[in-house]
Structure formats: structure tokens, C-alpha cells
Amino acid sequence: PGDQPNFPDMVKLNTNENPYPPAPAVATALHDLSVDSLRLYPDPVVSKLNTAIADFYGVKLEQVFSGVGSDDVLAMCFLTFFNSKKPIFFPDVTYGFYPVWSELFQIPYEKKPLNDRFELVKEDYYAENGGIVFPNPNAPTGIALSVADIEDIIQHNPDSIVIVDEAYIDFGGTSVLPLIDKYDNLIVVQTFSKSRSMAGMRIGFAISNPNLIRVLNDCKFSFNSYTMNQTTIAAGVAAVSDRAYLEETVAKIVATREHAKKVLAEMGFQFPDSQSNFLFATHPDYSAKELYEMLKEQHIFVRYFGTGRTKDYLRITIGTDEQMETLYAALRAYFQR
């Protein structure tokens, strides 16, 4: 997991959290929750939350599976569907949990290299495989793949489960949720941790065809029927019901991101055109480690990976305008020494 520092004066831009609070209805839902209800087990099928998600996205209730964050949902998908002797495919620069789960569950895998511009090469995913998973937009690069390219990958893999991890989709790119009813091998996974400001509540979900969702539930129930607690369910229902707040918050983050691109580019940083809530930035004159350590000393925390193709890059979460100005000031002062 990413570092979780705890300083009163810190600027935390290292774990892609939303800098704004959850929808106001979330606080109301938690306040109104009956303490007496906590003596009862929660609903194992999370029907209230799944119904709210289904209504928001215009799908059927039986097409929704919820878990304790998208990590939980993705891990359950790996365990349920990636059981072939053939390797699963995912990018070489991507979400770090994919190889971890693969090794934990003894799933063979192949990393498909992104090109020199950190773009996914769709043709690399046409070979025989045991399944496919990738984020869109990708993490940590922020680059979004088109719906047409994703559909090409799905069409070339009719016998494989294709999981599109859309943790950051609300900040840019186009969701492939409309393809769910067209392809019965597609699973789309999203989270409440980013655009809905609820990383601390741990809510993720998958949308797919009812048959795959049924199998996911069977696998989940074989481990733990009660994975989501009552407070989380209540907060999740409230969060998903407020479309206007979601759109307002996302718009602020996107505006700050686009401004950050201009400011950091003027300082000499280079980065792919992120469609997410972070920038994947490198500087030709300063090492990523040097900048990371300098910022850390000032309690400004960004993500430094330090290995492989990402060793020269920092992943900078988009914070509030005030937080970003603190970052810019620290960088300018360092460059002007």
C-alpha cells in the first residue's frame, strides 16, 4: 500500500485520494443510522447498495457485485475466473496489485510492455491467454484507452474474461459499461474511493452479466458472507444517490489537473496526457528520487516508485488548488536555489 503519513501540516498527494469530502448526504446517513441495528448481521447480498448502484448506472440489480473496495472485487475476480494454465495478460506499467494477486493465487501471467509513450498496444492482447485485466485510465500513467480499442480486445478474446478496471474513469476517458450487454465475457470494476471521496469506507463494485455476477457471489460466500458492514452500506447508498455532487467534485479536480499540467510544464516537467486525478511526471534535470526526498522533508508527499520504467517518474495526486500551490512553491524554490 501507499504510505499513509500523519502530520498536521502535510500536503498528501501520494495515494490518489479525493481532496474533497464525501457528499453531504453521507454524513446525514451515518448520523441517522440506528446504533441498535449494529447488533444484527448486515445484508450479505448488499441489496440496498447494489440497487442504488444499478439505478445510477442503468443496469439490472443482478448485474451488480459489491465488495470492500475495488481491490476486494478485483481479487475475487482473479480467484474466481483466472484459473486456466494459460497466462493472464496485463500491462508492465500498471496497478501493482495485479502481479501480487497472480502470485498469491498461483495464476500464470505475462506483462505486456506499454510502448515508449506508455500507451497500451492492443495487438499484444490478441494472443491466446487465460484472461485479461487492465485499468482505464491506466495507473500510474493516467492514459485512457478508447472504447473502440477496448472493444477490439474483447472481440479478439471471446473465450477469455476481460476485466476493465475503471477506478479513475470519472475523471476522463469513456466507460465501457455500455458494452456489458453486448459481451458476456466483460467485467467492469469501479470504486467509491476516488471520485466519490470514500476511500476510508472501502466500497468497490463490478458490473457484468448476471451469470458472472452469480459465480462471483458463490465464490464470495464460500469465504465470508458478511464482507460489508452496515455503516458502509448506509454511506454508500447516500453517496451514489447524489449525482450533482459527484459531477461538481469531479469538475473541480479536472480543472485543477488541467491547470497543474500548464504550471508543471512551465517548470520543465514532462508527463503523459493524464485523464485521471494524478499526473505521472518526470523532469529532465532532476531525478524523481531527489524531488521526492526534497518534498517529503517539507511534508509534501507524492508517490515515488523507484524501480523499472517508473524510476524516473513521480505520481502526483491532484489536490485542492491550495495544496497544489504549496507543491508549486516548493518546486520553484528548489529549482531557483
Regions found by a protein language model. Give the residues of each.
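PLP-dependent aminotransferase class I/II
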Residues: 23, 45, 185-265, 269-272
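PLP-dependent aminotransferase-like
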Residues: 80-135
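PLP-dependent enzyme catalytic core of the Aspartate aminotransferase-like
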Residues: 148, 294-303, 307-337
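Conserved PLP-binding catalytic core of the aspartate aminotransferase-like
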Residues: 253-254, 266-298, 314
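Active-site pre-lysine segment of PLP-dependent enzymes
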Residues: 119-128, 140-162, 166-198, 210-212
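N-terminal "arm"/small-domain region of PLP-dependent enzymes with the aminotransferase-like
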Residues: 1-40, 119, 128
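Phosphate-binding glycine-rich loop
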Residues: 37-38, 47-87, 285
